[in-house]
Amino acid sequence: MRISIKKILDNESTAGIFLLAAAVFALIFSNVGFLHDIYRHFLELPIVIGVSDYKLDKPLEFWVNDALMAIFFFSIGLELKRERIEGQLRHFSQVFLPSFAAIGGVIFPAVIFAVINFSDSHALRGWAIPTATDIAFAVGVMALLGRRIPTSLKIFVLTLAIMDDLCAIVIIALFYSTALNFTYLGLAFVCFLVLLVMCKLKIPQKIPFVIMSILLWIFVLHSGIHATIAGVAAGFCIPINTSRGNSMLKEMESSLGYFVNYVVLPLFAFANAGVDMRGMQISYLFGPVPLGVMLGLFLGKQLGIFTFSWFLIKMNIVGMPDRANFKQLYAVAIICGIGFTMALFVDNLSYGGSDLYHHTDKLAILLGSIISGVVGYFVAKAVGNKPKKGIKNEYN
């Protein structure tokens, strides 16, 4: 039984299913009378951590969005470092095409959103909402396709999603920070330096890294930079190998995997996908903000990723991914329009949970992501390789 449960949890599509289920439950709770009140009380549940003057008294929604998501970003930092040193980001030739494609996948959606919302300065704060790919959902769709899509394109999507996350981190740090408190920023920098020194010394104990990472998060939280950036910074400071020869980074990445995929991200989806559609009119979805989000995710991502990839390949700067063709490349570009987690996260930073747009900004994220996933799946299935009978899905 334990082995079968582990096999299910290790399956690439399971995390995406959990995320989708959490989003569906959030929608149900938000739109059913008595459940709506339970849902709101749940998110507003006060949680106090600390003692006396040194405590944080915040609602559950804050702890999910700013603390648990910092752990998610910490896992991204670990993944980026591992891939940079030992994985697909190590070789320039392997990373150049998906990196360049990721840039296109950020520029096109942002431009589409900005053009549609150019006359509204407040709406323009959401320009980055449709720029990121949700790696859990994208990989889940790829898993359902199995051998219809060559392995090289699956690696392309994984690398692109990683680079997308890196772009999102830079965007959050540069464009979604408030007025800076240089005292706390200085303290955060000291913590970061201490983490770097401990990494250089390859200290084998995890506790010092955990303590310094928590302090870094607290100081960044009060500095004006979004607290999740502390998670990424701390992740980069975990040593690949310690003085005892074990890989602390891989151990942490492994131990956090299930927690992030099956607790952090579903909780985040449940806390943020709850769009109250009672009294919502269909016409609201055709407002500039939701239209910019949906078109950015569905059209912007696929056009940006495919156009930038096509240019590099046609100019013979890079080659086509092994055993792939342009039709298959276009299909996976559509799949990359699944924004969901990061899009909801940036939406919160942009509009602070405001209902100014009748929550259609969040609904547009869900619709744009669903359309991208469904259309991308069927296009990929139509243009993909025909799997031979008797060969199992390589993800199983």
Curated annotation (Swiss-Prot):
Recorded GO MF terms? sodium:proton antiporter activity
Q: Which family does it belong to?
A: Belongs to the NhaA Na(+)/H(+) (TC 2.A.33) antiporter family.
Q: Which residues cross the membrane?
A: 15-35, 60-80, 96-116, 126-146, 155-175, 179-199, 207-227, 255-275, 290-312, 329-349, 363-383
Q: What is the lineage of its organism?
A: Bacteria, Pseudomonadati, Campylobacterota, Epsilonproteobacteria, Campylobacterales
Q: Which domain of life is it from?
A: Bacteria
- Tell me where it resides: Cell inner membrane
Give the record's keywords alphabetically.
Answer: Antiport, Cell inner membrane, Cell membrane, Ion transport, Membrane, Sodium, Sodium transport, Transmembrane, Transmembrane helix, Transport
User: How is this protein situated with respect to the membrane?
Assistant: Multi-pass membrane protein
| Task performed by this protein | Na(+)/H(+) antiporter that extrudes sodium in exchange for external protons.
Q: Which GO terms describe its cellular component?
A: plasma membrane
List the catalysed reactions. Answer: Na(+)(in) + 2 H(+)(out) = Na(+)(out) + 2 H(+)(in)
Stored InterPro entries: Na/H_antiporter_dom_sf (IPR023171), NhaA (IPR004670)
Q: Where is the signal peptide?
A: none
Keyword Transmembrane (UniProt): yes
Q: Which HAMAP family match?
A: NhaA
Name used for this protein in its record: Na(+)/H(+) antiporter NhaA 1
